[in-house]
């Protein structure tokens, strides 16, 4: 039985771990991020991967920082055949990668060499890509730079957001890994070096990027909203109040009003201007301190004062 140390943290990694267990790989330990406080009540919560490991009585290691930790020494001493990672969230020291008797591999959520880094799914949606995918690569010291063993593609549509794509890619990644590992173990897998001229990066989304730019064309604005959904949500300042836009529909009609202005408003519909004289319909939003609302609920409640012609979204809260 091939022994594995598995590293992962979010829901994306859970089907991959479950797949390895189902295929009778010997999971010596699971390494995941420490429990974090979540939600308004700031309750301590285990990562999805930790929860999955505990269901199978697999030992769990949770170093705050892996490098130089007792958990690192413990993992190296296990001398696994394979190290498998999927969205773990920490840098892996070279001496740990070298502890694998066969190889250390990573399931990465993009079609490498495009989108190395921590937010490949968000950037693929944000940039309006027609497809994304997963890549099985060798783990090396340089981030996401190892040779590629396999790729699988996934079409993207306007119905997708980061949540839906995460779910689809986790299953695609599981299947691709389970198909590829036997070839890697047997030494028959083909290695393809990444083309350095085609490398792009997808750094972790910053707080500043959550502030939506109303001067973008409506199509690009929609892409940003979907890229930031469902976890954080993108926001604007609507009448000076921080308001999250959860769903919009770009429209074909244009408008000469300034970006952030209301083109049309009735009890059930709100049409606004984005950049380059494009327009969009607001479908779902969330005023500060309140729950998500349909546009009808908003217009018949907190948004009653809005009228056509007003410029209500501004770059700053003043």
From Swiss-Prot:
Keywords: Protein biosynthesis, Transferase
Pfam family, one: Formyl_trans_C
Positions of (6S)-5,6,7,8-tetrahydrofolate binding: 110-113
A GO cellular component entry from the record: cytosol
InterPro entries in UniProt: Fmt, Formyl_trans_C, Formyl_transf_N, Formyl_transf_N_sf, Formyl_transferase-like_C_sf, Met-tRNA-FMT_C, Met-tRNA-FMT_N
Assigned EC number: 2.1.2.9
Alphabetized GO MF terms: methionyl-tRNA formyltransferase activity
Reactions mediated catalytically: L-methionyl-tRNA(fMet) + (6R)-10-formyltetrahydrofolate = N-formyl-L-methionyl-tRNA(fMet) + (6S)-5,6,7,8-tetrahydrofolate + H(+)
Residue stretches in coiled coil: none
Role of this protein: Attaches a formyl group to the free amino group of methionyl-tRNA(fMet). The formyl group appears to play a dual role in the initiator identity of N-formylmethionyl-tRNA by promoting its recognition by IF2 and preventing the misappropriation of this tRNA by the elongation apparatus.
NCBIfam families documented for this protein: fmt (TIGR00460)
Family: Belongs to the Fmt family.
Protein name (database record): Methionyl-tRNA formyltransferase
Species for this entry: Lacticaseibacillus casei (strain BL23)
């Amino acid at each position: 039985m091939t022994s594995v140390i598995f590293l992962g943290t979010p829901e994306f990694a859970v089907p991959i771990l479950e797949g390895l267990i189902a295929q009778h790989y010997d999971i010596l330990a699971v390494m995941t991020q420490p429990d974090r406080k979540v939600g308004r009540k700031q309750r301590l919560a285990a990562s999805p991967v930790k929860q999955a490991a505990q269901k199978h009585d697999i030992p769990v290691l949770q170093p705050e920082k892996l490098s130089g930790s007792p958990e690192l020494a413990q993992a190296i001493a296990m001398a696994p055949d394979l190290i498998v990672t999927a969205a773990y969230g920490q840098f892996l020291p070279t001496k740990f990668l070298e502890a694998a008797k066969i190889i250390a591999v990573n399931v990465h959520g993009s079609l490498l060499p495009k989108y190395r880094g921590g937010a490949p799914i968000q950037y693929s949606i944000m940039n309006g890509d027609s497809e994304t995918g997963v890549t099985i690569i060798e783990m090396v010291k340089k981030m996401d730079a190892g040779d590629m063993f396999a790729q699988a593609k996934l079409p993207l549509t306007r119905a997708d957001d980061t949540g839906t794509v995460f779910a689809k890619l986790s299953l695609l990644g599981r299947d691709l890994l389970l198909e590829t590992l036997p070839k890697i173990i047997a030494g028959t897998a083909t290695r393809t070096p990444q083309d350095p001229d085609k490398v792009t990066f997808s750094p972790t989304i910053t707080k500043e990027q959550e502030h939506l730019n109303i001067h973008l064309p409506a199509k690009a604005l929609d892409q940003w909203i979907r890229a930031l959904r469902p976890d954080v949500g993108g926001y604007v300042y609507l009448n000076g109040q921080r308001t999250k836009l959860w769903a919009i529909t770009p429209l074909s009609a244009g408008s000469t009003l300034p970006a952030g202005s209301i083109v049309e408003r009735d009890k059930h519909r709100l049409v606004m201007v984005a950049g380059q004289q494009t327009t969009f319909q607001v479908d779902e939003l969330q005023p500060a301190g309140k729950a998500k609302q349909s546009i009808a609920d908003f217009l018949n409640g907190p948004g009653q004062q809005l009228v056509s012609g007003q410029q209500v979204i501004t770059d700053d809260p003043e």
